[in-house]
Design a protein with these regions (language model features):
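Conserved alpha/beta-hydrolase
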Residues: 1-2
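Conserved acidic catalytic loop of the alpha/beta-hydrolase fold
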Residues: 5, 16-37, 46, 50, ...
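Short beta-strand immediately N-terminal to the catalytic nucleophile in serine-hydrolase-like folds
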Residues: 38-40, 65
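Alpha/beta-hydrolase fold catalytic core
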Residues: 127-167
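Alpha/beta-hydrolase-fold enzymes
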Residues: 58-143
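Short acidic-aromatic active-site loops that bind/stabilize oxyanions
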Residues: 8-16, 143-146, 150
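Amphipathic alpha-helical segments that form well-ordered structural scaffolds
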Residues: 21-25, 111, 152
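Short, glycine/acidic-rich beta->alpha junctions
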Residues: 42-44
């Protein structure tokens, strides 16, 4: 993103903003004014709830799963701990990094590995056959997430943290 909104200066975005952008795209580019359903997982579930509240005439039904209409304190803390893991890397440099903060991105990935997959998933070792051990499964996740942009991840987390469909 060009200055003045580059790096950590990108403006705050709300789930409501995402829904409005999607609605405008659907209408302007595809001529779609009504959706059969909005299906969403996690932050996508938040968007589904927002569609129902903001544009009830434009969506027949919603199928939100693994998400809430409001981010509660536990979710806010979980997100804050992921951000702390990422920003603890000195290379992060308050978001003005010149190279990816690799150890921070790795910490972010490992944090999410504990949340994205359930205790039961890890206990039953469902990471197999893709990985032969927990360490290998974590290494694969870190590698998969390595190209992600740290400031983008934080912007997404902040969007998630602030969401309350009732606001």
């Amino acid at each position: 993103t060009p200055a003045p909104f580059d790096g950590p200066r990108f403006p705050a975005i709300a789930i409501r903003d995402n829904v409005e952008a999607a609605r405008r795209l659907l209408q302007a580019e595809f001529g779609i004014t009504r959706l059969h359903a909005v299906v969403g997982f996690s932050m996508g579930a938040q968007q589904a709830f927002q569609w129902a509240v903001s544009h009830p005439d434009a969506v027949s039904r919603i199928v939100p799963y693994c998400g809430t209409a409001k981010t509660y304190p536990h979710g806010q803390v979980r997100l804050e701990s992921a951000i702390a893991a990422l920003t603890a890397d000195a290379a992060f440099n308050n978001g003005d990094y010149t190279a990816p903060p690799r150890s921070g991105l790795a910490a972010w990935s490992k944090h999410w590995a504990a949340w994205v997959y359930s205790q039961e998933w890890w206990r039953r070792e469902l990471f197999r056959p893709r990985a032969s051990s927990v360490d290998e499964a974590l290494a694969q996740r870190v590698e998969r997430d390595a190209p992600r942009d740290a400031n983008n991840l934080i912007a997404q987390a902040r969007t998630w943290q602030r969401h309350n469909v009732g606001d």
